[in-house]
């Protein structure tokens, strides 16, 4: 993810439907900070968030990746994913999340990868379950 992705990321992170389980959709400045945070993650850890693009057309679809998150005072590796509303339901979040999970275990030698999911976000939970994740805490 780079600064060149700002317009596409604004379309994604500024979308009320995509951000339904967050406090609110993000402003352009907030999205730029999100991109900066992702770039910082790459500089510090060697990984972060990726843009999801269509293999053939290069059209923007969403984002996915691995980031360190603090959960109850413990640093955990999280897989996250967001897909534009018009591309949801096509297995793209599952494909991206699955690739991230493999990268976490096979390349980064992670012992655990988590997904922080709002309990009401059943679509995201189904993605996590499809890639073999299980609920361990509510």
How should these model regions be labeled?
Residues 38-51:
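A short helix-loop-beta-strand connector motif used in the catalytic cores of GNAT acetyltransferases and
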Residues 1-21, 49-138:
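Acyl-donor (CoA/ACP) binding surface of acyl/acetyltransferases
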Residues 25-26:
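Short glycine-enriched, charge-decorated loop/helix-capping segments at active-site entrances
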Residues 35:
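Short amphipathic alpha-helical/adjacent loop interface patches that line ligand
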């Amino acid at each position: 993810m780079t600064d060149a992705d700002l317009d596409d990321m604004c379309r994604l992170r500024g979308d009320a439907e995509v951000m339904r389980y967050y406090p609110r959709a993000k402003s352009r400045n907030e999205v730029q900070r999100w991109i900066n945070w992702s770039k910082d993650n790459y500089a510090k850890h060697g990984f972060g968030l990726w843009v999801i693009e269509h293999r053939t057309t290069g059209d923007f679809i969403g984002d996915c990746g691995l980031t360190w998150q603090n959960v109850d005072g413990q640093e955990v590796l999280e897989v996250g994913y967001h897909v534009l509303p018009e591309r949801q339901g096509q297995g793209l979040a599952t494909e991206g999340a699955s690739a991230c999970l493999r990268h976490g275990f096979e390349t980064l030698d992670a012992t655990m990868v988590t997904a922080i999911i709002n309990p009401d976000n059943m679509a995201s939970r189904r993605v996590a379950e499809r890639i073999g994740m299980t609920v361990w805490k509510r």
